[in-house]
Amino acid sequence: MAGQSRPPHDRPEHLEPTMLPTTTFSPPFTITRASHVALAVTDLAASRDFYRDTIGLVVTEESDDAVYLRGLEEAAHHSLVLRRAEEAKALHIGLRVRTDADITAAERYFAGRGVDHERVEVPHQGPTLRFRDGVGTHIELTSSMETVPRKMAAFHEFTAGAPQRLDHYQVATHDVQTATDFWAGLGMRLSEYTAKDGTDELWGTWMEVKGNTHDLVFTNGRGPRLHHFAYTVPDATHLIHAADVAGATGFGEEIDRGPGRHGLSNALFLYLRDPDQHRIELFTTHYQFIDLEDDPIRWDVSDPRRAQQWGMPASRRWFFEASEFPGEPVRDPLLTATPATLEDYLSLH
């Protein structure tokens, strides 16, 4: 392959013993997928309009204080909740577990390990449990939701990017190793990872439970903060249409990155910022990761192809800005590896 001495997924022989986690394939409770995210927003109507008209999500229900939205193929009541607040925050990211018994098992597991957790009543959801993971990420588990009609065949209602379903989250954390170990212990499997050059020090990890490349991503940075949440779209033309609609609705300058193609996950992508600067990704074409003999793909942090296969790199704000969780201290990262940014690229050219 031109300009490349070995495939990016080959682990160099000179590296020290691996720091990669061992996945627990019989976890204490069963997580099935990324499910729903809740955001605190300062202008509820403006945020609703952005996600409905510029992104293309379906409004399931709204009140004076909250708006519930979903993708076109989703039967669950919501995958995005917007809540009116004085200050913009990422309230929590949600994961589904298989049954009500898994919520009880999670309570038992966290109690035995001193992990703070709370059973809560949440509108439109079944048994729900909130906790913080090993690096302070605010998590909500639920075993069920009210169901609504899928809109995937209502092609006359497709607008903007026509998002199909919520797929994953990316969280900036001060300690990628601790975060990765925590979730591997709960059954998540590493599909790809970025390491500090010449080492297996983890700079970023892509972890999955549903058989594609990621449900939950951790990257090195000040955290915990929610970098983005992501929805699949039908194809590449919908990414371009989403960009056109963003320009037409006054959000052209809020296109944060792309369109482009990641090396990690192989996805075509487009990132946008909402009126409170929360970041959403629309993407398509990632791959299956199911067979247990598949090893995780490794990338050097200095390799620009990991983040973008063509075009210029992302700006500093894409790498370093993210949404904080309420009341959660933000810590400086343990690693100092710094990705190449658009500003770095322009200074050299």
Language model feature labels by segment:
Residues 47-52, 110, 136, 179-184, ...:
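Conserved active-site tyrosine of GNAT-family acetyltransferases
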Residues 161-253:
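Surface-exposed interaction/gating patches
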Residues 57-90, 137-146, 192-227, 233-236, ...:
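Conserved short beta-strand elements that form part of the metal-binding/catalytic scaffold
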Residues 29-76, 120-123, 130, 171-213:
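Core segments of cupin and vicinal oxygen chelate
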Residues 12-49, 53-108, 112-118, 323-349:
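The feature marks the first
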Residues 9-27, 33-42, 85-174, 193, 202-207, ...:
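Vicinal oxygen chelate
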Residues 1-10:
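A cross-taxon signal for low-complexity, glycine/charged-rich
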